[in-house]
Amino acid sequence: MTSTPQPSRPSSLDAEIAARLKRSADGLVPAIAQQYDTGEVLMLGWMDDEALHRTLTTGRCTYWSRSRGEYWVKGDTSGHVQYVKSVALDCDADTVLVKVDQVGAACHTGAHTCFDADVLLKDGDSGVPAADQ
Amino acid sequence: MTSTPQPSRPSSLDAEIAARLKRSADGLVPAIAQQYDTGEVLMLGWMDDEALHRTLTTGRCTYWSRSRGEYWVKGDTSGHVQYVKSVALDCDADTVLVKVDQVGAACHTGAHTCFDADVLLKDGDSGVPAADQ
């Protein structure tokens, strides 16, 4: 994409990071939370510039809630805190990967990760001949 | 969110899956590609209903390219194919996690993953006192 929406809200995010961040039309980028030691993908949230800034500077994962329209510090309500271990942007700066140490369940359903319950395909059983794999 | 945009394009996706898929305003959902055995997060792409259908049924990861406005079978140009091992939706059906076996580099830059080059924070060095972690 040749242009990117500007931040929707005021932010203290480092100007150089903000300059290369490529936001969706709603001013957000998807943020993948991954357990730092096991590699499990825990959940995907959304960050605006300020949520990324807070994630980088407070040691706690902070997201922008699209449904509630407010910042959301993971674990503030549930106790299921995500302590930030590392943060990276992807090659075109439109996705964040946060490696975290997750306290308790990552999912609001109580499941360990948000991807445990709704498995569409397992064990590569898509009918593709083994010779093609 | 109480409603979700409908598919933008015709699709053969299973009707029950399509009924619970919660798409962004552009009709897409983010899709995380993770190496199935090492747990590395390789990249994030975008899928519409038909890209998800093809990913579920062909054994190859298929995305919707937002910049080119077309389907994109990972590896068709580069040879860096992603063979599908499993596919899951998250708890609110607005994100896809695809575990894959990645051939070669996942990133178009030649890097192993798309998250290798632009690290914003390492080793939890956010200045949070150790006692709080």
From Swiss-Prot, chains A, B:
It holds the Pfam family PRA-CH. It is found in: Cytoplasm. Keywords: Amino-acid biosynthesis, Cytoplasm, Histidine biosynthesis, Hydrolase, Magnesium, Metal-binding, Zinc. One of its GO terms (cellular component) is cytoplasm. Gene3D superfamilies: Phosphoribosyl-AMP cyclohydrolase (3.10.20.810). Zn(2+) binds at residues 91, 107, 114. One of its GO terms (biological process) is L-histidine biosynthetic process. This is Phosphoribosyl-AMP cyclohydrolase. The lineage of its organism: Bacteria, Bacillati, Actinomycetota, Actinomycetes, Kitasatosporales. The gene is hisI.
